[in-house]
A protein has these predicted regions:
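Auxiliary tRNA-acceptor-end handling modules of aminoacyl-tRNA synthetases
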Residues: 1-25
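Polyanion/phosphate-binding surface patch
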Residues: 2, 45, 49-82
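Positively charged, Gly/Ser-enriched RNA/tRNA-binding surfaces
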Residues: 25-42, 51-52, 69, 79, ...
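A structural preference for short, hydrophobic beta-strand core positions in alpha/beta folds
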Residues: 46, 167, 254-256
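Beta-rich nucleic-acid/ligand-interaction surfaces
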Residues: 50-67, 166-179, 259-267
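Acidic, His- and aromatic-enriched active-site or binding-groove loops in soluble protein domains
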Residues: 65-77, 181-210, 274-276
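Hydrophobic secondary-structure block in the mid-to-C-terminal portion of proteins
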Residues: 158-195
Length: 329
């Protein structure tokens, strides 16, 4: 009989003590992250791997690559469209609403498998583990500093080099609307040079075009308006204060071109990058999403979160500590 093999991009993880094994690094990373989350007095939440597909269409965005190209979705025996979760935040917020927990503040963490149909490469798989932090019910201010503090603790704990945290602010709803209007006006003469996907982004969510992977689009955007000219001074001051407070611990860079690939982000956004990962150099990201809860049927719940890809992060550890010298942290 022919052998049955694992599916493309799906890894078996086995903690056999071999320090050259990615599995061992994954287990080490998970163990340390759990300890860091405990130090920050975060509570664990676990949500189902399967969710209603509409949850991700309404949260991540039906124009996102995740929903259009990467999500594993299918109809169950009742012809209901369900999906393997491609990310963790939407499920957490769905649970918060369903359990009527959106009336109070919470500080949570989660860790579990996620699924995306993308081209497997080093540190990127079709089934991957993701850890995340969600700080819910707290207005903008202290949570931004706390989330960056958590990231700096992770970077410090693993002694990471060649990495930095990029931060930006997408402004208020009014700021964003003014910026999007200016962006659309700038891109209008260039519409014939945009591909179909970017044209759709331009018409439905112009901010997302800044996240385009199309080189021609990025060339056009070189002289586009900057969101820095549209957000208020307090937002800029927050970015400067965060950079100032943590600059002696981590490399912090204000990047006004940074947007996140998920539709629910608003206000403060960030990502951690490493030059050791090559062109796709991000291993952690997140931001504020004050309106996601109400978009999913709950009440407005000011919130901020972050997520880290475990395998991708674990692939960095060889650049920090040689495998044969790696010990438990």
């Amino acid at each position: 009989m022919d052998k049955i093999h694992s599916l493309t991009g799906m890894l078996d993880l086995y903690n056999d003590g071999d320090r050259d094994n990615l599995s061992v690094k994954v287990f080490e990373v998970e163990k340390v992250l759990k300890r860091i989350f405990s130090n920050y007095q975060l509570n664990e939440m676990r949500t189902p791997a399967l969710e209603d597909t509409d949850l991700f269409k309404r949260s991540v965005g039906d124009l996102s690559d995740i929903v259009n190209k990467e999500i594993y979705s299918f109809n169950d025996r009742n012809e209901k469209s369900i999906a393997l979760r491609p990310e963790g935040t939407a499920g957490v917020i769905r649970a918060i609403i369903e359990k009527k927990l959106d009336q109070s503040a919470h500080k949570l963490w989660y860790l579990g498998p996620m699924w995306r149909y993308e081209r497997p490469q080093k540190g990127r798989y079709r089934q991957f583990y993701q850890a995340g932090v969600e700080i819910l019910g707290y207005p903008e201010g202290a949570p931004e500093f706390e989330i960056i503090s958590i990231i700096c603790s992770i970077i410090e704990e693993f002694k990471l080099k060649n990495c930095s945290i990029k931060i930006n602010h997408l402004g208020s709803k009014t700021d964003k609307e003014s910026f999007c209007e200016a962006l659309v006006n700038y891109l209008e003469p260039h519409k014939d040079n945009l591909d179909i996907k970017d044209l759709e982004r331009l018409s439905r969510n112009p901010l997302r075009i800044l996240d385009s992977k199309n080189e021609d689009t990025q060339f056009i955007l070189r002289d586009a308006p900057s969101i820095k000219d549209f957000i208020d001074s307090s937002s800029i001051q927050m970015l400067q204060d965060i950079r100032s407070q943590f600059s002696n611990i981590c490399s912090i860079e204000i990047d006004y071109s940074l947007v996140r690939g998920l539709d629910y982000y608003s206000g403060f956004v960030f990502e951690a990058v490493s030059s050791d990962l090559g062109a796709q150099n991000s291993f952690l990201g997140g931001g504020r999403y004050d309106h996601l809860c109400s978009n999913l049927g709950g009440r407005d719940l000011p919130s901020i979160g972050m997520a880290i890809g475990i395998e991708r992060f674990a692939s960095l550890l060889d650049t920090v500590i040689p495998s044969n010298r790696m010990t438990s942290f």
